[in-house]
Amino acid sequence: MLRIAILGRPNVGKSSLFNRMCKRSLAIVNSQEGTTRDRLYGEIRGWSVPVQVIDTGGVDKDSEDHFQKHIYKQALAGANEADILLLVVDIRCGITEQDAELAKMLLPLNKPLILVANKADTFKDEHRIHELYKLGISEILAVSASHDKHIDKLLQRIKTLGNVPEVVEEFSEEEVEEEAVPSMELLSKEPLSDYEEEEIPFSTTSAPDKPLKIALIGRPNVGKSSIINGLLNEERCIIDNVPGTTRDNVDILYSHNDRSYLFIDTAGLRKMKSVKNSIEWISSSRTEKAIARADVCLLVIDAQHHLSSYDKRILSLISKHKKPHIILVNKWDLIEGVRMEHYIRDLRATDVYIGQSRILCISAATKRNLRHIFSSIDELYETVSSKVPTPVVNKTLASTLQKHHPQVINGRRLRIYYAIHKTATPFQFLLFINAKSLLTKHYECYLRNTLKSSFNLYGIPFDLEFKEKTKRTN
């Protein structure tokens, strides 16, 4: 894999260049300095080799921002990780002291280095390029990331430096399938006989060869980045006790026990009225997008605090997108005199969604139960990806009906002729019944709870679809 690192002082347009190269809006772009703090990873598609682009935070050693030492460390790690380096400067400002410091840091690495003179929006701007040779970098290219000017020349130069063969860009069959919206006839048009099995395709979007996408979500300062760093045994995300340290969604690819995971470390959601029209609001909207994108969501809460309205809001977003999830109760090392099972029992009683979730108490600080996160994710996703056999579904429902008969309404009783596990994403059962008017909310809840406990569907939002069918008579 060819790796390209983008470096520079704050507010020179690194994230705009990153988004332009990846052709996706992965990094937050804003005029406020320090928008990007962690390393962000993207990819350039359509090349003959895999290409990863690393966006780093703005380095300014003279800044009083206490995040700067962490940002510098992350930027240096990105530079060491990369094969080709892009030092981005603002051509309109000329050479600054920070630009010179960064050039001194990167030149000794003896890696292909391009000085990207960004914000060359006009012909006059481009003519100022000769001033930049004082930095001692021979490769200089003027571009405008915001106007997509000369980006193609930059990419071509990267191909040359990286010895990337030219190919005709085309989408692979795998990429086409990934973008396609599945369409299928789910139900047979033939009448359903009494307990007669129908040939109904089972729908699932699981792709075992692709990384399992895991979104870490939660309020600011609950330890999401600490959990990531603890799992990976390296500092990939900046950690601080100031809420809102992570602003971008940070994608981190990691392999464990021959399985690939793509962790998405998200910005914490905050009260909407306090973040409107700001970077934090953008981050909040990105958090919901990360939920929609994920295969499994990990909601992180602080063991020291009661479940807040914001935690419930996040959980409702997970439910809205029907995502399998696990609640991670972090900072368990700070809890004294409480048995874990009692804590979990009391937590389940606080909210209906919590009561239906899987809960794991952990400590990122001491790494207690961190490795159980992987096994919990695998178990949850295995349940989601597996079809419940039709005979098992119907045997379970038959037992359910015997234990608790539906009530009689106007001389008639609800009959369930047949049921199948219809889809995995979202998880859905299809039940064929005699009349929807005979199905009460109470009995639907009873059926839901029975299926949830019978097939261990805790942490898996699932739907019950009811379809009226007339029982075939001979």
Swiss-Prot record:
GTP 1 binds at residues 8-15, 55-59, 118-121. GO terms for molecular function: GTP binding; ribosome binding. It comes from the Bacteria. Residues 386-470 form the KH-like domain. It holds the Pfam family KH_dom-like. The keyword Disulfide bond does not apply. Keywords: GTP-binding, Nucleotide-binding, Repeat, Ribosome biogenesis. One of its GO terms (biological process) is ribosome biogenesis. The keyword Nucleotide-binding applies. InterPro entries: G_ENGA, GTP-bd, GTPase_Der, KH_dom-like, KH_dom-like_a/b, P-loop_NTPase, Small_GTP-bd. Transmembrane segments: none annotated. GTP 2 binds at residues 218-225, 265-269, 330-333. Residues 2-166, 212-385 form the EngA-type G domain. SUPFAM superfamilies: P-loop containing nucleoside triphosphate hydrolases. GTPase that plays an essential role in the late steps of ribosome biogenesis. Associates with the 50S ribosomal subunit. PANTHER family: GTPASE DER. NCBIfam families: GTPase_EngA (TIGR03594), small_GTP (TIGR00231). This is GTPase Der. The lineage of its organism: Bacteria, Pseudomonadati, Chlamydiota, Chlamydiia, Chlamydiales. The gene is der.
